[in-house]
């Protein structure tokens, strides 16, 4: 089975007025093609910080340790340019945040929001984006995707 993602010795710290807070300490795991992986733990244990690190979303005052390695298909992604991060986030890897209200716009339909991301990253027509979005909803088990797209 091919390795898709490998995280080695991930450590993330944040500078606060009280000093450095280590949010993630020496986390390592591998995700193989075709496998399902869950990051589980109690509140505040670093699940979201780990996921954000993989997505390149840790910003100051946070910092991923220089000793950490995040390899996507064997390539170290930590030094990606802005353009490379945009391509990675849109084409290769995605994240679904737990708090839907913080991540989704309640004034737009689900379909429109998914289509928007598809069109930004794939440069396809509205119809193609609609079909792909509906297919994505069906793949994750959402019933009646054509109806849900309009909600």
Regions flagged by a language model, labelled:
Residues 1-151:
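ABC transporter nucleotide-binding domains
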């Amino acid at each position: 089975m091919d390795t898709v993602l490998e995280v080695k010795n991930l450590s993330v710290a944040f500078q606060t007025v009280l000093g450095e807070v280590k949010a993630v300490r020496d986390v390592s795991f591998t995700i193989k093609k075709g496998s399902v992986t869950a990051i589980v733990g109690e509140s505040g244990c670093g699940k979201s910080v780990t996921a954000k690190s993989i997505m390149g979303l840790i910003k100051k005052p946070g910092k991923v340790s220089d000793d950490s390695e995040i390899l996507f298909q064997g390539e170290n992604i930590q030094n990606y340019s802005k353009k490379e991060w945009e391509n990675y986030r849109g084409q290769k890897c995605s994240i679904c945040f737990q708090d839907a209200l913080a991540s989704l716009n309640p004034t737009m339909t689900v379909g429109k929001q998914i289509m928007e991301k598809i069109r930004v990253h794939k440069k396809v027509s509205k119809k193609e984006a609609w079909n792909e979005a509906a297919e994505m909803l069906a793949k994750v088990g959402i019933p009646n995707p054509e109806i849900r797209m309009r909600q």
